[in-house]
Each structure stands twice: as structure tokens, then as C-alpha cells.
Swiss-Prot record:
Catalyzes the transfer of the diacylglyceryl group from phosphatidylglycerol to the sulfhydryl group of the N-terminal cysteine of a prolipoprotein, the first step in the formation of mature lipoproteins. This is Phosphatidylglycerol--prolipoprotein diacylglyceryl transferase. Coiled coil: none annotated. Its EC number is 2.5.1.145. A 1,2-diacyl-sn-glycero-3-phospho-(1'-sn-glycerol) binds at R138. PANTHER family: PHOSPHATIDYLGLYCEROL--PROLIPOPROTEIN DIACYLGLYCERYL TRANSFERASE (PTHR30589:SF0), PROLIPOPROTEIN DIACYLGLYCERYL TRANSFERASE (PTHR30589). The keyword Lipoprotein does not apply. It comes from the Bacteria. It is a multi-pass membrane protein.
């Protein structure tokens, strides 16, 4: 069994100002996305550093607003009704990937209108940069001791740990780390490799939806369902799995459509 590194959720104390690890992870996520997108822009025609900076800014707004609103609507609407101010207390945790995803989709529409880019051209460009942000987000969940995994059934399982935030003090899967590795690092490697060569329009976005859909669906089997949600469908499907199934199906259709149409709207690489 591993020992949980009980880290102070406040990373930096600056007098009355407290910088939480959760917020710091979001900052690192956006900086990493900006760096990766800037690198991709240098490899392709039609993209500038100003466009990338604006793209990340729009995306950050979509993630924060959509993620928080989505979490409230999908998971904690009753809590919001009791205390509407809680919606704005982002530093306490509570963000939904699916809400953040929808928020980014909407934000990209405004960015595309400003820069006269097609929606899928933009999504294909930024999709490989997203998984690193997911990775940092899950690390933030781990440090905060939230969204931990289900209880370990094998007493000899070497990676189980007891989270101090768990009222039952059971040995559990560190599912946040599993998700950081699968939905984050592994998906990033796959998407970065796939997008390094010319692909049909929508193909990279489709692979993101498929890859995240599969990874999230599998990881939910290790993650403890929210106490007020439990298993919603068939006695074993969680809210996260239900919300992920449409992403997977849409991704499959998009990949099929992309290779049926074979429209290549990416500019040639500058260094080729």
C-alpha cells in the first residue's frame, strides 16, 4: 500500500492571499496548452502567435465557465439552489469535464468568427494540446484528495492508499493518477503523433472524442461514484460514463465521415 502525500491544499501564502494547488494546476494547464499550440503554429502556415494567445484565452474562459456551470447542473444543482454564491467559489473544487468541453466548443465559435477559421480546422489544431490540461487537472484533484477511487478488493494491491478526506478510511485506488496518465499523458502522446501528419478535416477532433471517451469510460470503473449520484443505469453505469457515451459515438461517426470526405484544409508545414 502507498502512503498518500498529505499536501497542504494551499500552495502559496502571500499575506491574506492564498493560491490553492487546484487553481495552480489550471494555470499550468493553460500555460502548457499555450506552449504546445505555439509550437504547432510555427509548423504550419496561417497561424500566428497572437491567434494562439487569443485561442488559449477563449478556451480558458470556456473551460472555467463551462466546467463550473456544468458541474453545478450535472452533479450539484441542489447545492447551488441552497447557496447560489457557491457557484463562484471555484477554488473549492468542483469542475465538470463535460461542461468544460461544451464551454470550449461555444468559445471556439466566437474565436473562429473573429479569425475566419473553420470550426473543425480550429478544433483539429487545438485538440492535441488539451490532454495535458486534463492531466494537470487530475493532479489537482489528487492533491485536494477529491474524486478518489473505489475501495481496493485485493489486499495485496500495491498502489492502494487511504485518503484523509475519505470518511470511511478505506484503502482505495488513486484513480486521479490513473486518469492523469490515461486521459492525460497517454491520450496526448497518441494525438500528438496522429496530428503530426496531414489528416482529413475532423479526424484529429474525432480521435480526441474517441480516445477520451474510451479512457474515461474505463477509468470510471476505478473511480468512486459521487455519493449523491451512485450508479444510475443498469446498476453499474455512472453519470460520467453516461455523459461520455455520446462523445464516443459522435467521435466514431466523425472519423468515418472524415475519411469518407477526405477534405484536407491544413496548410503545408513551413519547414517541409
Amino acid at each position: 500500500m502507498l502512503t498518500y502525500p498529505n499536501i497542504d491544499p494551499v500552495a502559496i501564502h502571500l499575506g491574506p492571499l492564498q493560491v490553492h494547488w487546484y487553481g495552480l494546476m489550471y494555470l499550468l494547464a493553460f500555460l502548457c496548452a499555450w506552449g504546445l499550440a505555439s509550437y504547432r503554429a510555427k509548423q504550419r502556415d496561417g497561424w500566428t502567435s497572437d491567434m494562439v494567445s487569443d485561442l488559449v484565452f477563449y478556451g480558458a474562459l470556456g473551460v472555467v465557465l463551462g466546467g463550473r456551470i456544468g458541474y453545478v447542473l450535472f452533479y450539484e444543482f441542489d447545492k447551488f439552489l441552497e447557496n447560489p454564491i457557491w457557484l463562484f467559489q471555484v477554488w473549492t473544487g468542483g469542475m465538470s469535464f463535460h461542461g468544460g468541453f461544451l464551454g470550449v466548443m461555444i468559445a471556439m465559435l466566437f474565436w473562429c468568427k473573429k479569425y475566419q477559421k473553420t470550426w473543425f480546422q480550429t478544433l483539429d489544431f487545438i485538440a492535441p494540446c488539451v490532454p495535458t490540461g486534463l492531466m494537470f487537472g487530475r493532479i489537482g484533484n489528487f492533491i485536494g484528495g477529491e474524486l478518489y477511487g473505489r475501495a481496493v478488493t485485493d489486499p495485496n494491491y500495491p498502489f492502494g492508499m487511504i485518503f484523509p478526506t475519505d470518511p470511511l478510511h478505506l484503502v482505495r485506488h488513486p484513480s486521479q493518477i490513473y486518469q492523469a496518465l490515461c486521459e492525460g499523458l497517454l491520450l496526448f502522446i497518441i494525438l500528438w503523433w496522429f496530428s503530426s501528419k496531414p489528416r482529413p478535416r475532423m479526424a484529429v477532433s474525432a480521435l480526441f472524442l474517441m480516445g477520451y471517451g474510451v479512457a474515461r469510460f474505463v477509468m470510471e470503473f476505478f473511480r468512486q461514484p459521487d455519493a449523491d449520484q451512485g450508479f444510475i443505469l443498469f446498476g453499474w453505469m455512472t453519470k460520467g460514463q453516461i455523459l461520455t457515451v455520446p462523445m464516443l459515438l459522435i467521435g466514431l461517426w466523425m472519423m468515418w465521415y472524415a475519411y469518407q470526405k477526405k477534405i484536407y484544409d491544413w496548410g503545408p508545414q513551413k519547414n517541409s
